[in-house]
Amino acid sequence: MRSLLLWIAVVVCLLCSVAAVVQSGSSDGFGKPRDTETAISFLEYKLMAPSVPMIPLTLIHGADSKGAVCLDGTLPGYHLDRGFGSGANSWLIQLEGGGWCNNHRSCVYRKTSRRGSSKFMEKALAFTGILSNRSEENPDFFNWNRIKLRYCDGASFSGDSQDESSQLFYRGQRIWQVAMEEFLSLGMKQANQALLSGCSAGGLASILHCDEFRELLPSSTKVKCLSDAGMFLDSVDVSGGHSLRNMFQGVVTVQNLQKDLSSTCTNHLDPTSCFFPQNLVSDIKTPMFLLNTAYDSWQIQESLAPPTADPGGIWKACKSDHSRCNSSQIQFFQEFRNQMLFAVNSFSNSDQNGLYINSCFAHCQTERQDTWFAQDSPQLNGKRVAESVGDWYFDRAKNVKAIDCPYPCDTTCHNLIFE
């Protein structure tokens, strides 16, 4: 009964958030009112069964003494479901997503939400998909120690600075470090297998921190990384501008990310370019799996056709429901898909890496049960996402790389429709 009540509370909370978002509009596409991540989260929770187990929030006590705090100065937190049986010494770390804040206004706003303060985080979260503890839902990782690290810094667990006047703490890198120390003390230092994963902004974080994660663990530990919906592209928007580049430039500058970015990249590119994964993935030494839809819903909503690039609302219907797009709009999406394939081309040449690019209009497929491992889940070459990730991680197959044919050929997609 307690789990059911918690589940209802989470859904009601998300519904209220979405209603507020829809009513208030947006002035900059990335600031206070619009929250595409919240809308996507709500759509995902609608698909969730009430019987899903709820995992309580744990705050990292003492983190504040190391300056590892959320945007508002509160303690960071995580949810841990302990492993059992053959998975007792295996660890999966899932980095939460939730966009970014790129200026004073948007960062101050996040202080009043779970994206910037543990005061507003759910006290328990449902573990589904790659976090599920049921073998029929998560065949390869169900009995591992599974952790979801909450996201409250606004810069993909990167950055180390402070805005004294507004009491804003940009401490993503410190949160990452203190969380890893906590997990190592809980037993991860004895892990025989480990997987660093993440969705959206967390998927970008898994790319940024992959090699660092490898270095934390003994050389005898099998370590790999998974980025779900983390391939954010430096693309031109529908107005010919660079909405996401402008956004990332603000994040890098405001949160002082320069020193945390890959020196291999910053030696020849500007810091903003080195926050884009397309300029990072080929240089990662640790085995990495990239999972992404070719028509990523978040990027369509917020990078390709944000309100600032479409003031007349010509793209509003199309970006909410791809079935309402005209032929020229679909062609624009096909060009975006081509950019995605070009961005992963060099990465895919490595035998140790894995790839799964399906032609769906979705965002984050590892934590949704319907897209991770269900009877009617999306498939590529007859494999569901969970099966492909498992084949790659456990070396059950060689060259685990699959790229879908262009839209509309894939009939297995679970596309997101924004009402």
Curated annotation (Swiss-Prot):
Task: Report the gene knockout effect.
Answer: No visible phenotype under normal growth conditions.
Q: What is its main location?
A: secreted
InterPro entries named in the record: PAE/NOTUM
Question: Per the record, what is one GO cellular component?
Answer: extracellular region
Subcellular location per UniProt equals: Secreted, Cell wall
Leader sequence segment: 1-20
**What GO terms in the biological process aspect are recorded for it?**
cell wall organization
Enzyme Commission number(s) from the entry? 3.1.1.-
Alphabetical keyword list: Cell wall, Cell wall biogenesis/degradation, Glycoprotein, Hydrolase, Secreted, Signal
- UniProt function note: Hydrolyzes acetyl esters in homogalacturonan regions of pectin. In type I primary cell wall, galacturonic acid residues of pectin can be acetylated at the O-2 and O-3 positions. Decreasing the degree of acetylation of pectin gels in vitro alters their physical properties.
Similarity comment: family membership: Belongs to the pectinacetylesterase family.
- Name by which UniProt lists this protein: Pectin acetylesterase 6
> What organism does the record attribute this protein to?
Arabidopsis thaliana (Mouse-ear cress)
Q: Gene that codes for this? A: PAE6
